[in-house]
Amino acid sequence: MSYYSGYSGGLGYGYGSSFGGPGCGCNSIRRLGCGSGYGGFGYGSGYGGYGYGSDYGGYGYGSSYGGYGCGCRRPSCCGRYGFSNFY
């Protein structure tokens, strides 16, 4: 499953990471899980984005702060699900 879009600091989209990391939508390099990092869209966008699992102020499945499910950044909400661990 090659769910990633290799953009370095750009806009990740679909199943894809913003920072060109592997897996289904990384937040930054080597971060796996669903939900791209910054300004992405589709499955897991980053800052103020939309879709599954946005990071900051987004909506959908699992935002970073107080979010849940797929596409969190912080291990407090991500580690338990095994999605998109920040560390």
Swiss-Prot record:
Keyword terms, alphabetized: Keratin, Repeat
Disulphide bridges: none
Gene Ontology CC annotation, any one: intermediate filament
Subunit relationships: Interacts with hair keratins.
Similarity comment: family membership: Belongs to the KRTAP type 19 family.
Function noted in UniProt: In the hair cortex, hair keratin intermediate filaments are embedded in an interfilamentous matrix, consisting of hair keratin-associated proteins (KRTAP), which are essential for the formation of a rigid and resistant hair shaft through their extensive disulfide bond cross-linking with abundant cysteine residues of hair keratins. The matrix proteins include the high-sulfur and high-glycine-tyrosine keratins.
The protein's name: Keratin-associated protein 19-1
Organism of derivation: Mus musculus
